[in-house]
Amino acid sequence: MATFLERYQAGDHLAVWDELMALGEGVRSEHCYADALAVAAETMRRARHNVELLIQRLDAKGYRFRDRVSSAEEKISRLDVMDQMSAQFETMAKRTPTSYNIHSMKMLETMQAMKAKVAPLLEKVAANAAKEAAAKRKPPLEDPYVFSPPDAETPGLLERLEKAAGGPVPLSLRAWYEQVGGVSLMGSDPALNPVDFSNRNVLQQFQSLVKGAVPIPSPGEECAPDPLVIYPLDALMEDLLDEDSEESDDGDELQLVISPDDLHKANISGDAYYITLPDAGADFKFDDWHKDRFVNYLRKVFQWGGFPGWARSKNPPGKELAELSEGLLPL
């Protein structure tokens, strides 16, 4: 009788993962654990191949990744926007009718006091951001903001994660971090991901608010492309430390952020995608808008060239997405 791995390698991808999930915690039984783990590892080896190919193809298209340099430029832009908003608020406060002026001035004083208090920190942030923005841009596969593959610390971090969670992580998640690591396809491109990370939109919305106007969404804003982002394992551990410092109402369950959600990725105030641990199953529910299992989520990611949010659009950039997804390995 063929093993799960042999069947998976022969192309029976969907059925194998369905059967592994149907086993529940039994997937960790002595007679099938090694086989199931091998399937998870093979799946994520394919995922890594696809991730690296997508990054290379996006780079060749001139995609502007949200890498170390552009992230630093974004910080500088955000600080500049804060200064402009503060100045505009001061002007607004002075022009406010007398009956409201007292409240406006109090708000302004509070804002200025907070700004003065954090000024040294902001100066340090600005200096570090300027230094990083001036640095030479690395190829995206070498930039940890885009791709951070597993290293010698990965096994120890996984062990610490399971110890903190009080139980195992799903086989698919373990294999992801052992084979792939952290990935972020966040960035901007006129067709694939028309997102402005300069924070100019924040200033424009503030200006509209000051003028009493309501911003009108631009065409196409109804669809967030939702590029693939899975936080590095060390970022999950930082989130875990934050969890430890707060009291949880979930009993023994531990909820960690694994990725920003589609709106957050689009530079709109959003939330995140979470994972709940411990989980002894083969795979886990990926808490995005699909509400599907992680492996199925990855299948959709690669089907849509790294941008599964376009599945909701009536007019996706079909040519570009087809070029990105061509020849990717099936999971």
Task: Briefly describe each language-model feature range.
Residues M1-E159, E178-L331:
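A C-terminal-region feature
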Residues P170-V180:
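Short hydrophobic alpha-helical segments that form membrane-spanning helices or hydrophobic packing faces
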